[in-house]
């Protein structure tokens, strides 16, 4: 008898080399958090300027002269389009990211700062769902047109 995942894969015409990912087995490990992600950007300087001046991240340089933006316990590694480090995404492209960043600073203060920096708010404040609860968000674009969401957890707002 075929396992159900193989039967469904056949019906959905999933390529046979992907069928193994449809197994019911669980991995013997647990992912705890996101350490870093990579943004492919058109200009390192413009990106670093935006994320440090507008969002308050810290620019760092690590081995090989690579650039990153640090905040909290995470970082965003930066790859310049056409000069990516290996290994890299299959199709690295500026402007394809959608990031949600959490702050405890009231969004009214965030919006005032964005206006002072000349960064238009694309949408918000609006209610959304975050990883661990309801959030209120404002949206903007970075220099590569990535969608950047800055949010407060509603539970943090109610505590104040």
Swiss-Prot record:
UniProt domain VOC: residue ranges: 33-153
Family matches, as CDD domains: GLOD5
Family the UniProt entry places it in: Belongs to the glyoxalase I family.
Name this polypeptide is given: Glyoxalase domain-containing protein 5
Domain of life of the source: Eukaryota
PROSITE patterns xref list: VOC
